[in-house]
Amino acid sequence: VLWSREDDMAHDFYRPASYHRISGAVDAQGQIAAWKHRSTSTSIASWWDRAKPAESQELGSTLQMPYLMKNYKLEYAPADSGVPRAWWRSVEASFIGFVMESYMDELAHAAGADPLEFRLRHLDPARAVANAVDPKDSNPLVCARMRGVLQLVASKAGWGSKLPAGQGRGIACHYSFNSYAANVADVIVENGKLRVERIVSAVDIGTVVSPDGARAQVESAVIYGLTAALKSQITIQNGRAVETNFNHFACLKMDETPHIEVHFVPNDLAPTGIGEPGLPPVAPAVMNAVFAATGKRVRRLPLLPDDLRA
């Protein structure tokens, strides 16, 4: 049986939706005093097995918080939906990375701190965080390695240099699939229109077995992440998907693709994942750059055409 693209997009599985509400505070010393994260999402696990409760995977790296803070509270409630759903590149990290790193940026500005310095301030190089999602996983999140990708990407991107009016630079990092990734995004916002000029990525995946293949994976993750953040949206009306082809469900085109730089942290540790970890920091780096350029916070994806015109 040969399906048309319209048939395929109308009857395929879709990326889960999620909603997050975060509140927090910083103290007089500029340290995070509290972080409360409430979220709900349409569970992948419960779609495939209705008798199975939403798995802890939906919480992802919220259960493996890299940033040191005095009080951290996490609440989750599964949301039911009749929309068929399944895995998408980087799974729950694709939206959790956006949420966590966007809010980390908001806390940095609330503290009057540089976003890079604020992140480093809360990453204790002597600290390792066990995997609460999978107790059998012997690979903890090593904060020193997260610091390493942040420092490398900042150095390569020229973090701290002054930009002209209407331009912004944002930073974000995330840990997934036992790998560490950080992005710096440079954007231009003019007359309510956004153009991403450059993405610099730094990744720590242990020993890089195939440099060309690994670099291609990160570059494609950037393009995937930008497509999802800036264009991809499925809307459901009368029980069916409205968008059924690429004229309505657009992908990032070649002339819209920014200059992409990829850098790897050199080490001789065991190789870890590379196909997905490059994606989660893309959207928050871009939207943090949008804030730097415009003073407007983007808290919903994808970014719609009118979001920056208001």
Where are the regions a protein language model picked out?
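Cofactor-binding beta-sheet edge motifs in enzyme active sites
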Residues: V1-A310
